[in-house]
Amino acid sequence: MMLKPSIDTLLDKVPSKYSLVILQAKRAHELEAGATPTQEFKSVKSTLQALEEIESGNVVIHPDPSAKREAVRAKIEAERLAKEEEERKIKEQIAKEKEEEGEKI
């Protein structure tokens, strides 16, 4: 029985079989957790779906893991700052409304 995608095809996409296993496992976990698929799948199982994505080149190992971590940190920080700004605007609006109510009385 020939398995698709073949190991030879997959090893052209990643540096080693160990990297392939790690990449497949991480992507399968992401798919199980509800991550958006990058393509339509022939397979039902998330592990095989991950291999299909690797074969098509839609999922790759990040060449610089520290840069990826820094990008994730920057995104989280930007989201935090946006949330703080939104909270500040809401508090200002509430204070303004209370001030206007105080003038009416």
Curated annotation (Swiss-Prot):
Signal peptide: none annotated. It comes from the Bacteria. GO terms for molecular function: DNA binding; DNA-directed RNA polymerase activity. Its EC number is 2.7.7.6. It catalyses: RNA(n) + a ribonucleoside 5'-triphosphate = RNA(n+1) + diphosphate. One of its GO terms (cellular component) is DNA-directed RNA polymerase complex. Keywords: DNA-directed RNA polymerase, Nucleotidyltransferase, Transcription, Transferase. InterPro entries: DNA-dir_RNA_pol_omega (IPR003716), Pol_omega/Rpo6/RPB6 (IPR006110), RPB6/omega-like_sf (IPR036161). GO terms for biological process: DNA-templated transcription. NCBIfam families: rpoZ (TIGR00690). Promotes RNA polymerase assembly. Latches the N- and C-terminal regions of the beta' subunit thereby facilitating its interaction with the beta and alpha subunits. PANTHER family: DNA-DIRECTED RNA POLYMERASE SUBUNIT OMEGA. Belongs to the RNA polymerase subunit omega family. The RNAP catalytic core consists of 2 alpha, 1 beta, 1 beta' and 1 omega subunit. When a sigma factor is associated with the core the holoenzyme is formed, which can initiate transcription. This is DNA-directed RNA polymerase subunit omega. It comes from Streptococcus pyogenes serotype M5 (strain Manfredo). The lineage of its organism: Bacteria, Bacillati, Bacillota, Bacilli, Lactobacillales.
